[in-house]
């Protein structure tokens, strides 16, 4: 089977088609990334008017800062909780669609509603429900003798931001898992049922391996989501507290750059975070292309 490359009448047309994307990439990624890398090697005054080259001193100081290391491990813990919990809960709800006979459309619509809610609004919603004084959920917990106050308890604060972040991301994961499960040939499921395999066994032995590429894709997407898109949730719910218990890397960058006006340190932290995201992207492009072949 022979293949030929498309031929454009004008030699400039391909460049014109690619130009908008290149311009957006340069303005909104390459230029800011270059600025962050430059500032990370400088000692900058709070207003950014003067600077002095200091090499890697900002990075050395960064990795000797106990508060930064704490935020680093907080990010690892937070992103792990958000990613694992979000994927498991979404997969469970997507698998339930097959067993809902009546009201399945309403169920699917209900599962997609959180996606229409902004992250900050999602955080405020759960803050109202978990309000220590008048929250509906805290009142219910008080009936069982459990005292809830996420402003003073670091574990409760972490649970709140993880819960709100997972709730916000459920719709996105549910949509992909549902589409992946529906794409599985029904003949495989029916053949396994005829052979005596129950619903649980059919799910773990047939469905789960076949949706592995989608699961891996969502794993990477949810890690990036936990690193970046959860900033509004943390800012609205806990502001990184109590005692920096919920201060992630992205929130520490914001606090030191915009509040503390330490541009060099925040730039160095941005470079470290950018490196982590690049690694995740490389992993995604390297492994997510694995194909599933139906025999």
Swiss-Prot record:
The keyword Transport applies. Keywords: Cell inner membrane, Cell membrane, Membrane, Transmembrane, Transmembrane helix, Transport. The keyword Membrane applies. It comes from the Bacteria. Pfam families: BPD_transp_1. GO terms for cellular component: ATP-binding cassette (ABC) transporter complex, substrate-binding subunit-containing; glycerol-3-phosphate-transporting ATPase complex; membrane; plasma membrane. GO terms for biological process: glycerol-3-phosphate transmembrane transport; glycerophosphodiester transmembrane transport. It is found in: Cell inner membrane. The chain crosses the membrane at residues 12-32, 81-101, 110-130, 157-177, 208-228, 263-283. It is a multi-pass membrane protein. Residues 33-80, 131-156, 229-262 are periplasmic. Its main location: membrane. Induction: Induced by phosphate starvation, via PhoB. Also induced by carbon starvation, via the cAMP receptor protein (CRP). GO terms for molecular function: glycerol-3-phosphate transmembrane transporter activity; glycerophosphodiester transmembrane transporter activity. Residues 1-11, 102-109, 178-207, 284-295 are cytoplasmic. Residues 76-284 form the ABC transmembrane type-1 domain. Disruption phenotype: Mutant lacking this gene fails to grow on both glycerol-3-phosphate and glycerol-2-phosphate. Belongs to the binding-protein-dependent transport system permease family. UgpAE subfamily. NCBIfam families: PRK10561.1 (NF007852). The complex is composed of two ATP-binding proteins (UgpC), two transmembrane proteins (UgpA and UgpE) and a solute-binding protein (UgpB). Part of the ABC transporter complex UgpBAEC involved in sn-glycerol-3-phosphate (G3P) import. Probably responsible for the translocation of the substrate across the membrane. Can also transport glycerophosphoryl diesters, which are hydrolyzed to G3P and alcohol during transport. The G3P moiety can be detected in the cytoplasm whereas the corresponding alcohol is usually found in the culture medium. This is sn-glycerol-3-phosphate transport system permease protein UgpA. It comes from Escherichia coli (strain K12). The lineage of its organism: Bacteria, Pseudomonadati, Pseudomonadota, Gammaproteobacteria, Enterobacterales. The gene is ugpA.
